[in-house]
Each structure stands twice: as C-alpha cells, then as structure tokens.
Amino acid sequence: MISDDSDRFNPRDPKPANAGKPSKSAKRREARQLATQALYQWHMAKHSLNEIEAQFRVDNDFTDIDGAYFREILHGVPANKNEIDTALVPCLDLAIDELDPVELAVLRLSTWELLKRVDVPYRVVINEGIELAKVFGSTDGHKFVNGVLDKLAPRLREAEVKAFKR
C-alpha cells in the first residue's frame, strides 16, 4: 500500500508540495539564531524579555521561523539561568562573567536545550551550538563552545550519550 505522502515526488509535477517551504529543523535553526541575538541583548542591555520579544517580532519576518520555539528559548533561558549556569561552571576554565557575551548566550541556549528539551538529541544541540558560535562568535569561539558542550552533554544526558557511543 502506498501512503498519501504530500512530500512525495510526483513525476507529473516536478515541484514537490513542500518546495520553497523551510523544514521544521530550518525554522528551529532560525529561531535559535534570533534567540541568541535576543539573549545577548537581554544580557547586555537588561531590557525586559517582553520588550525584547516585541522588538524582535517587529524587526524580523517570522514566516520562516518557529516563533513558538523562539519564545520558549527567550523566556526559558532567563527563567532557568541559575540552573543553567550551575551546570556550565564545572565545564568552564573561566568564570561566567569572564566569558564572551556572545559565547555565553550560545552556551546558555544550548545548556537550556540539553536540560529542558530532551526531545532534541544531544548531538543536534551540540551541532547547533557550534553553528551559532560560527555565525555570531569570535574567530575560534566555535571551538570553545564545542569543547564546553562536549564536556557538558555527558553530564546532563549521560544515558543518551552512552547509548550513542555503543
């Protein structure tokens, strides 16, 4: 039996039904990018989360962005800041307040995902963190983020990491 899969290639219509539409993972990647910028702004300017969210929604087209995920990250990271920072500290060679603010935003977002979004595989969290650091961080910031997340993931997702490495 052939299922009715709307994403399936139709030889009479060479353009798939989802052509031009970003995937769920692409929409989440965009949400993470905006959330990184918003978390940086929150950390540096100390504006309220609602003000930052409103401004980002005015300044950006959310058509191709997972807006709910952006909001969840933007409000979830500050709400869990103490838990996130406590998890990060053992994996750092510097104090939290000595970290580059962009790399701190990326690390907090990634740590939040490791702690609160167990539906997102740890390898995806690490990869997305590295990519965010490449886009927004310093020249070698992605290497630093990778090193920290590689230490952190087994602490927060021990069973998942062990299962993957078998």
UniProtKB/Swiss-Prot annotation:
- GO MF assignments: RNA binding
**HAMAP family, A to Z:** NusB
Q: Which organism is it from?
A: Pseudomonas fluorescens (strain ATCC BAA-477 / NRRL B-23932 / Pf-5)
Looking up InterPro entries in the UniProt record yields: NusB-like_sf, NusB_fam, NusB_RsmB_TIM44
Q: Which gene encodes it?
A: nusB
> Basic and acidic residues compositional bias: what residue ranges?
1-15
The Gene Ontology biological process terms listed for this entry are: DNA-templated transcription termination; transcription antitermination
Q: Which family does it belong to?
A: Belongs to the NusB family.
> What Gene3D superfamilies is this protein classified in?
NusB-like (1.10.940.10)
Cite a GO CC annotation.
Answer: cytosol
Keywords annotated in UniProt: RNA-binding, Transcription, Transcription antitermination, Transcription regulation
Q: Where is this region: Disordered?
A: 1-30
Kindly provide the name given to this protein in its UniProt entry: Transcription antitermination protein NusB
Keyword field contains Transcription:
yes
Role description = Involved in transcription antitermination. Required for transcription of ribosomal RNA (rRNA) genes. Binds specifically to the boxA antiterminator sequence of the ribosomal RNA (rrn) operons.
